[in-house]
Structures are given as C-alpha cells and as structure tokens.
Amino acid sequence: MRVGAGWWQGWWVLGVAGLMAWSGAARADAVLDWLNRASAAAKQLNYSGVYVYHHGEHVEVLRVLHRADANGELEKIEVLEGTPRQFLRINSDVYCHLPDGKHVRLERNAPRRFFPAILPAQLGDLLEYYDAKLGGTERVAGRSCQVVTLDPRDGYRYAFSLWLDKMTGLPLKSRIINSNGAAVSMFVFSEIQIGKAPGVQVFRNDLAGKRIQNASLDKPASAIWEVTPPPGYQQVQEAVRSLPGKQAPVTHLVFSDGLSVLSMFVEPVNPQMQSLQGLSAEGAIGVYGRQVDGYSVTTLGEVPSMALIETGNSVKRK
C-alpha cells in the first residue's frame, strides 16, 4: 500500500506542476493578447479625445485626433494650454508646427509615436525585459478598462501600468512608476470617442509661408561615436538638429527597448557656456552630462539613473 501511495503522490505532484505550468503559460498568452490588441488599436482605430499629461510638477492638456483608412494614418496632436504647439503625423512623417508660426520641423520615418500609441508593433523582445501581468478592472473616461502591469526585470527601466479599453483595447491611461513606487509620469484620457473618423479636413497641413526644417545627417553618428546602451535598448533614431540657443548643430540619438526611451545629445563644448557635469533632473526627466574629447554628451529620459550614467559613460570617439 505504501508503494502504491507513493506512486500516486508522485503523479499527483507532477500533475499539479504541469497544471501550474499550463496556467502560467495561459496567463502569459492572455497578457500578450491584450498588449497586441492595444498596439494595433492605437494605430488602426479612429478616435478623438482629450488627455492630460502629468510629468513631475507639470501638467499639460492635449487633444488627439486619429484617422486610419486605406491611405494610411493621420494624427493630429494639439497642446491646449500655454504655448501653442501642434504635431501632425502623415503616416510615418511628423510635422511639428513651432509656436512662432513661421517654422515647421519635419521628421521623416519618425519611429516614436504619441500617446496612446505607446506600444511597439513587435512585443516579443519587450517581454524579455518586463514581467507583464493582468490586473483588475477600472474605469477611465467612463469606460471599463483592463489593467496591465509591466515590471522591469532589471534596473535599467521603470515599471509601467496600462489601462486598456475592454471593448477596443485602446490604451486610455498609462503610468510610469519608479523603484520607490512613485509615479514618474502619467497620461490619462478625460474624454474619448472611439469609432468615428475625424474629417480629413482637420488634418490639413498648412505650410504656406512657413520654413521647413529637416533633421539632416551629413555623417552617421556611428562613424564618429561608439555608444553602448543598456541591454534591450536599440538605437531607433538619429538626426542632426539646429536647436535654439545652440551655436553648432547637435547630434541627437534615441534609444528604446520598445517602451522606455532615452535620448543622447552630442555637441561641441561651448567655452562661453557652462555645460552639465554629472547627474541632474528636469522635472520627471533624469539628465546626465559629461565631456568627451571636446564634446558635451548629455543623456536624458524617464529612465533610472543607472541607464543614463552607463550610456553616457560608454561614449567614445572613434
């Protein structure tokens, strides 16, 4: 009888272990399904609404209009308070209409998108660096949402919480949370209409009498600089920009793991201006600066200090 009992107990343990493994895989598949829905919804649905962006002590109110049809994507973002700003996406090109009303900054094949399109199209690599779990159900802008949490697997990124509309999957709220459990920044819709396409006329790109500033590249930064970002981060953008108050063009690099983003600016040292040395912060954005062979290197982003410091310290001139 004891042998029989041991045999049964052994199979019972294996059965429970198998059930737990299957249950874990099923939960992972369910989370991935939600994230895939959210990624597709932000790009493929028609919607319009107003959302609030909280970062540090600052608050901005923005209007988004998004249209998807046989011709592709149209998106318009308007800042509703303070200095007027407007961004217009026509498929992969983004036009930033500057406050002076005279200049438009054009970025072709822009990789980064605006909220609610915060998730990448390919999610497989993302889950190597985040542990994604389903939370409860909460309401945002009067709509029922599924909460999804993404906890970092290392110290190079913060945690994210997403509130996804249960009917469509569209992200209606997102929050970045640091290692102390405090909110770094948050987007949240106060009103949203999903399903009705905004008229094509609202996306008219008025360029009459305006000067278009193209981000240009005379020579790839990789030909001059060697940069090693944290694990999981890939370079997604590179440009040379003329920025206000800068005497020389600035090389701008963007690195992302698909969710977290950090930027790097490289410019010649201006002896008449004090450049940042060490770690600092601009509201919710961490900033790290150092000098390399007569150039100022600045890394910044809503990421842990370790990511900024290691990326900045990795920069070498070839």
Residue ranges and their predicted role:
Residues 28-100, 128-166, 170-174:
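N-terminal mature ectodomain segment of secretory-pathway/periplasmic proteins
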Residues 2-13:
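Bacterial N-terminal signal peptides that target proteins for export
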Residues 168-170, 177, 181-200, 298-318:
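Surface-exposed amphipathic alpha-helical segments
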Residues 188, 193-224:
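Pro/Ala/Gly-rich low-complexity, hydrophilic intrinsically disordered segments
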Residues 209-295, 306-307:
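Short, solvent-exposed recognition patches
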Residues 96-118:
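Acidic/charged, solvent-exposed loop-and-adjacent secondary-structure segments enriched in E/D, K/R, S/T
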Residues 111, 153, 177-181:
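A short acidic/small-residue loop/turn micro-motif
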